[in-house]
């Protein structure tokens, strides 16, 4: 068994045949609605009943250099949704998933009773990674926390 399942809706469909119920992901035109993915989380939890958390990354692609980025975390029957960031000048997407998982591990260990904050940390860490060339994240915890505090616009500057 596993404690945490991490992926995206495409992974769930291609690997397990799980699709969002009543929702066509291909019709979203780059927009993501996190609540639509609760059914995917529930289906994964049903398939893997010993899993404690399901996390889905949400990328909306405007173009090659402009994406939206967020995520959802499902645990104990509750869906948490991160802020959605607008990354307008992507430097390098390589390492984005690894930095998300690294941020999630850090967040879950640091904010042990706050799944929302752990998810927000993972998304912010990965978001900042998109502004750095190379396959690993070089930002500090303080930089991630500053982005988490943000001004609410969702725009990323580094």
What residues fall within each predicted segment?
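Structural signal for terminal/edge beta-strands and the immediately following C-terminal loop/tail
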Residues: 153-158
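Conserved post-catalytic alpha-helical subdomain immediately downstream of the catalytic base
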Residues: 80-151
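Conserved phosphate/ATP/ADP-binding segment of small-molecule kinases
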Residues: 1-78
């Amino acid at each position: 068994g596993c404690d945490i399942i991490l992926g995206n809706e495409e992974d769930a469909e291609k690997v397990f045949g799980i699709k969002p119920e009543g929702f066509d992901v291909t019709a979203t035109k780059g927009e993501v609605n996190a609540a639509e993915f609760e059914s995917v989380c529930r289906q994964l939890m049903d398939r893997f009943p010993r899993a404690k958390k399901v996390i889905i990354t949400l990328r909306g692609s405007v173009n090659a250099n402009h994406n939206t980025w967020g995520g959802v975390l499902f645990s104990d029957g509750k869906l948490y949704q991160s802020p959605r960031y607008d990354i307008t000048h992507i430097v390098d997407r390589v390492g984005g998933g690894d930095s998300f998982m690294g941020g999630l591990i850090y967040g879950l260990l640091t904010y042990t009773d706050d799944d929302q904050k752990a998810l927000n940390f993972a998304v912010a860490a990965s978001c900042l990674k998109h502004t750095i060339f190379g396959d690993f994240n070089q930002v500090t915890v303080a930089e991630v926390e500053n982005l988490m505090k943000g001004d609410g616009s969702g725009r990323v500057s580094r």
